[in-house]
Regions:
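Sequence contexts marking disulfide-bonded cysteines in secreted/extracellular proteins
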Residues: 103-106, 171, 179, 196-198
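Low-complexity, serine/threonine/proline-enriched polar segments
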Residues: 117, 123-128
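Terminal connector regions
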Residues: 129-193
């Protein structure tokens, strides 16, 4: 005699199928929530470290003196690593400030230290590539004061900066998300995302 019991091959009750399907659905929902939460967290961290570099120039310094200033400002919320910087005069790349002045304004221009420290016709330059610019900071990479000895050069450079000088800057966040900005003036709100910054054929040094 066979012992009484549940016969082999008994069809599963429909409730068992529903329970199994429900468990699978719950697992999928939990996985989706976890993925979306992780993505949202990454977006929040990226947004909290997002840099925005804007290149600009002016003809008056913070004291109101006649000084031509070329600056890079980080208007974002995170630090920016400057990978490359290019400056063009009439679409021709410049290697530095001296070449720019010789091309735009005075062919025989030479850099010379002023005899007096308080002379107004000073000329100061600095590099841009390789710098880390923190949020809210400004790097000034060229300054030229207006004096009696350099009035013609100063005015020529002022005309050039308003009409013929353009830039291309590539920078990255601390998470190595990178952007290229090529727009002049205030409309620099939509830099182009890139996988990595290209190496320029002619980079601006100083």
């Amino acid at each position: 005699m066979s012992e009484p019991g549940i016969p082999k091959g008994r069809p599963r009750h429909w409730l068992e199928y529903i329970s199994t399907a429900f468990a699978v659905i719950i697992s999928l929902i939990s996985l989706w929530v976890a993925i979306e939460t992780e993505r949202a967290n990454r977006q929040m961290v990226a947004a909290a470290s997002w840099p925005m570099l804007q290149v600009g120039s002016s003809s008056v310094d913070d004291k109101g003196d006649s000084v031509i200033l070329f600056r890079v400002t980080n208007t974002g919320v995170g630090p920016a690593k400057v990978r490359s910087f290019e400056l063009f005069y009439k679409k021709k790349p410049m290697t530095g400030a001296v070449q720019l002045i010789r091309t735009c304004c005075k062919p025989d221009f030479t850099r010379s230290a002023p005899e007096e420290e308080d002379r107004k016709d000073f000329f100061i330059t600095g590099g841009v590539p390789g710098n880390v610019i923190r949020a809210g900071e400004t790097d000034t990479f060229m300054q030229m004061g207006l004096g009696t000895a350099n009035a013609a050069v100063w005015r020529a450079l002022n005309t050039a900066r308003n009409n013929f000088i353009t830039y291309r800057i590539c920078y990255c966040s601390v998470f190595d998300e990178c952007w290229i900005n090529t727009v002049r003036g205030r409309n620099q709100l939509d830099p182009t995302p890139v996988d990595k910054c290209p190496v320029p054929k002619v980079g601006y040094v100083e």
